[in-house]
Amino acid sequence: MDRRSEAFKIPVPEVIPAGQILSTIEVSSHRTLFDFFKQIRSDDNGLYAAQFDVLLGTYCNTLTLVRFLELGLSVSCVCTKFPELNYVNDGTIQFEVQQPMIARDGPHPVDQPTHTYMMKHIEQRSLSAAFAIAAEALGLIGGTTLDGTQISSSLRVRAIQQLARNVQTVLDSFERGTADQLLRVLLEKAPPLTLLAPLQIYRDEGRLASRVNRAVLVSELKRRVIEDTFFLTKHERNRKELVVARLAELVNCTAPSVAVTRMTHSDTKGRPVDGVVVTTAGVRQRLLQGILTLEDMAADVPVTYGEMMITGTNLVTALVMGKAVRNLDDVAHHLLGMQRDQVRANEKLIKDYEDVPSTARVRADLVLVGDRLVFLEALEKRVYQATNVPYPLVGNLDLTFIIPLGIFKPATDRYSRHAGSFTPTPGQPDPRTYPPQTVYFFNKDGNLVQLSFDSAAGTVCHSSFLDVDSVLVAIRREPHELHCAFGAYVTLPPAGTLLDQMRRFFERWHMLMPARPRWTAEALMTIDQLLSPGNANLRLELHPAFDFFVAPADVVIPGPFDMPNVMPTVMAMPRLINGNIPLPLCPVEFRDSRGFELSVDRHRLNPATVLAVRGAFRDANYPMVFYILEAVIHGSERTFCALARLIIQCIVSYWRNTHQVAFVNNFYMIMYINAYLGNGELPEECTAIYRDLLEHVQALRRLVAEYTVPGEAVGGQGHDALNNVLLDPALLPPLIWDCDPILHRADMGRARAQELWVDGVDYAAIPWVEMAEVNFGNTGGHLVHNRPIRGENKRNPIVPHHDPEWSVLSKIYYYAVVPAFSRGNCCTMGVRYDRVYPLVQTVVIPDLGAEEIAPTSPSDPRHPLNPRHLVPNTLNILFHNARVAVDTDALLLLQEVVTNMAERTTPVLATAAPDAGTATAVTQEMRTFDGTLHHGILMMAYQRNDETLLEGTFFYPAPVNALFACPEHLGALPGLNAEVLEAARDVPPVPHFFGGNYYATVRQPVAQHAVQSRADENTLTYALMAGYFKLGPIALSHQFATGFHPGFAFTVVRQDRFLTENILFAEKASESYFMGQLQVNRHEAVGGVNFVLTQPRANVDLGVGFTAAYAAAALRTPVTDMGNLPQNLYLTRGTIPMLDGDADAYLRRVVNTGNRLGPQGPRPIFGQLMPATPAGVAHGQAAVCEFIVTPVSADLNYFRRPCNPRGRSAGPVYACDGEADAVDVMYDHTQGDPAYPSRATVNPWASQRNSYGDRLYNGKYNLNGASPVYSPCFKFFTPTEVEAKGRNMTQLIADVGASVAPSTSNTEIQFKRPHGSTDLVEDPCSLFQEAYPLLSSTDTALLRTPHIGEIGADEGHFAQYLIRDESPLKGCFPRI
């Protein structure tokens, strides 16, 4: 058949029966197109292509709206055909709206009618689809490759059928695309219900009048997000009326359209439909099952659309109905048939414009929500099923959760309503009184999971924990004033004896301390006082493991005795031990509670021991002669054995007089008494006390081993020394009697860079000194090592008398046991040996005959304590006054002391670098300075009435540490003025040549703990011992692995993603939707022809307010596992390594072993280090938990409500209008937290600029681990993210709250969904800068009654606590 000479005619389909237009037009059109392909016979492919393009364009253009008009979504729009849409550059539409008026009485101005002119942009869009025809198929369809066989004819039919299927698929894509495009258009202009509904309440005359109202609005928004999100999931079971109320609010919070259209949708009874509710199939089904009543199952819908007319240049006026084709019967007759003989029919069509538009009845679900009749539509299956396009109403919601781990409640909250509710094992202490170390919660499947301190190893057991170099650089740029240098400056002692040095120090103390030091004031503060906005020193509390302080700049420590007048700067020193954390942030109650936990099932001192030792430490009449004996023995085992008889008589006499034990202030004496006098020489009860005391010291030593994981030495030190400072040889005991600790200290190696100054010069040891060699006025660096028991040869090398364990036990005794008994009422004293030895030689001993037996009673004239022998200023007087019964044989032994004498009390200043567990390129230059007395004594309770002490005859105060610096003992140094004595009551009078508080290993918080503690001695010894555990990464790895509370808590942050099912409501005729002429572009390709179909579209809103709104109605499923996967910085963070390679390797191995985020295989040379892939996944994508170090005393109630994980509110939404206000809200801690005005923060280690948490998670510092990909904390710590979200929130309120004011025709108002409003239903945590509390508890028993209102549902039981769910998920998981 030859068609070259015939005019091309588009085939006319069969007439469609009336009343079945929408259901049959597709079938008819498809048949027409198929018949056309079947009838084509031509060798001219060009003619075929032209004919096909025209047919295809007309075909698709005609049928695009067929399926769309069957959808309830068509209620919301006015569809208008606009063939010239492709030529529109800048389309705008003008509306005129008359504002309503209210006539009022009284003295009110008379209102005039107000007209508002509003102009809106036309937003241009397009739809595109494509398909291809292979060259072989073209040949078959065109007949060029037909060979006349039946096979070729069959192939041609199959080619035509395949082409028809392709075209049908393209048409189907346009039909689906129209619905998808309009749905997205409606979503673009629909603000969330949680925003739109509150604005109707808090809008004053159309706008938010003040920042107070805006603050109230923000508070309401927060509440509505929690309550309204997932309202269907929460209330569909028990409180269906709340679901109906939320739906009614959704359909009533929008503004009606300005369009008065002739096209109306109605039910079968003729009642107009007010709008459409679009949701998912699941939500639709749940709403129809007992929540909403189905009013009708069919609807009458119009089947016409308008036509655009061009009037003017670039200004398009939309005729809401326009000149319209009457119905789709006319479309089938006239648009698919364009013959000239049908023009007459078109003219008739125009004349019939005034006729009532035709409608078609389609199946629909019509429900009544309140008083509004709406379509209930679900497009999920009808439009989106089997496509690769996600359903827009299935969204993602990211929620960030916060879980407090290890918080210690204040005493008023550590109660139990019924102590018997959770009963421990009979006979055992209640573990619920211990500080919590684990928190339990449920994952997405309702399984109970936990996080403990060990989970945080990947965060703090990392070298970034020690990276403070950038912090120092930053804070040194700020101005600082040096109010008081005492405690922040160290010097060497001046020339002269220690007594002269002490006097010179007290004479010039006021120059170093013109004001009260910060470190003493902080030790007496409460947590509220420390964190108050008025605390100017809060800005230096930046890190849990470092002290930042103002000190003299450009002075090498130790500096000159008189501090030079230099500029101040900020210095940093490692706190070394958790006991040095300031008391307000690690309070005494917590330390004692931890000590009680450690004392359970371990050695405890007998009550008799406690009474006897406590009595000795508090005895104001303790015999002064005992201190004299200590001095002449001066730790010498040889001398002790020589004077054993005298010592026995002293101990026995004091025991009989007071039932207390002597010499408990001297560790060497206790050791010798246990070794030599414990076999019946003393009363059994007395011996048991010394033995019990030593066993307690050894038990404290074993405590360190129990909380240390065994391993190979690192940096030349064992792990117990890296874990507890008392086992570190770098720290000397406060009192030494020989050179043993110094010799053991020298074995540490050069890496510790230890230095030692003895009396200000280098150290040198001498074996011993006899009477002929003694020089009491000696100065310099010589220290007497004491005479050994055997091997007496001064030419032999000087070796220790005892093993290193002796020094360890000595430090444990002095730093843990002595403070527990003395409670700060003791002081290290210097000894005036130039007076002590002459006094010892003044003893009066009566002569006895060779056959006479020494008398035992002082009433005997031959007894040395008989009144006739009590000569003034003799040793006899001291024994007599102390009621110590000694005999002649015992006193004769005193002549042995001259064979091994002490010359002086010598000040020793020792310094050391950090150990291998804390040494990095930043910390290696930080040195500790600790003072020690060689040949000094520890004086217990001060004896106010002893004249020899008051005059400083034999002893004078020489405090080496705040633990041994009782101010009353300064009375033994005559001549001190009242100002010094008064200052010593507030500030420990430790000379700066014995170190300074910030440079000492043991600092003021430990001393104040001993003073303020109300715990018994057993608990306090363990509590003090726990305070000496170190704060380095390696030490923390041991403590976490063994269940030791490190003295700080954590804020756990986790972000989870949930799939949501949203509900969209749109007013009827609220959107004008324009469709241009479809264009077909043909592109020749290798092997065939590609066809690309493009149809321009446009839309414009027809409202003077928001005509659509949506809400997250139901929770579909959690995407993440809501689990307990801890962050591992070794996988995400690069930072300075540990200086010791073994230490760095040890940390990596310990942290990564068993860690689910451990690196996969060896570290690659190129590329990124990736985590190991698990063999299986059961609960979904693992959500990462990050840890923010938090003070253990943080307010637990802060975590019971939505809060900022930093510990302080952030975001411009809280700020005023100043440019710097938003930054000040986030970082200016001189102002209170907007949410908690009485305090600046709840966590100074994270909320302040350059704090540890800020440096760890703030993306501003360009750390590769601080990113939104790896870190859920990123959005809370990064200022740009906070400001961006805050600006979104501010602009959101301003945009949505703006009223339509009288305006000119040039005003353009687009009621679009404000930028950032989607965060209300997608990421509210970043918008509000708050994370939500998750149902969690430190005790699984509390989780068994978690629901509010349930009988017995307690939030706490002693030290344990329960945090209730205050998130939008509350009520969504009834099984949890």
From Swiss-Prot:
It comes from the Viruses. Keywords: Capsid protein, Host nucleus, T=16 icosahedral capsid protein, Virion. The keyword Lipid metabolism does not apply. One of its GO terms (cellular component) is host cell nucleus. Transmembrane segments: none annotated. The keyword Transport does not apply. Its main location: virion. Belongs to the herpesviridae major capsid protein family. This is Major capsid protein. It comes from Equine herpesvirus 1 (strain Ab4p). The lineage of its organism: Viruses, Duplodnaviria, Heunggongvirae, Peploviricota, Herviviricetes. The gene is MCP.
